[in-house]
Amino acid sequence: MEGASGGIILKQFELPLNKKINGLSTGYGSIFRLILGLSVNTPYVLFDEPVLGLDAQHRDLFYKLLVQKYAEHPCTMVVSTHLIAEVADLIEHTVIIRKGRILQDAPTEELTAACWAVSGPAGVVDSWAAGRDVFTSSVLGGLKTVCIRGGGTEDLPAGLERRRVGLQEYFISLMEEEDQR
């Protein structure tokens, strides 16, 4: 990476240079592998659970360096992760795979733009949601939240609230929908 040689990145992550690779902790092993990934200039870079074992500060540093690398050397970066909320703002295209089957493969904005969470008193939510494309729902006390696909949330009756669904909530809702099949 321009402006950030491997040595500088090593110092930023405080990687111990006096240990063998197999003697590194889980976190520092992850740091070693992600430094390798950040240092190559290839058309494709694959990161499989790159922040495994990293503390919040090191995860944040990795995400910043990932964006910097992309800005300096645009390429396709595949990031496989369970920490969806942490990377959601970095992801342009999302592929959701479950048990070897692709469930979704689309631009991230396209996946979440048409999904809404609507919540309020259970009876009011049920009446309003009837006939809509509800793909998951949850109840907490007397409040109910449904996640719906498509528009049509402009006509909410009094007492209901809507908000956009983020990528992690979309993912969880999709998995719950799959579980019900």
Sequence positions of predicted segments:
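Short loop immediately C-terminal to the Walker-B catalytic DE motif
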Residues: V51-L52
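ABC-family P-loop ATPase nucleotide-binding domains
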Residues: M1-F32
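A short, surface-exposed alpha-helical micro-motif characterized by mixed small hydrophobic
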Residues: V87-D89
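C-terminal coupling/interaction segments
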Residues: D133-T136, L140-R181
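Conserved H-loop
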Residues: P74-L83
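ABC ATPase "signature
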Residues: D105-A106
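Helix N-cap at the start of a conserved alpha-helix in ABC-type nucleotide-binding domains
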Residues: A56-H58
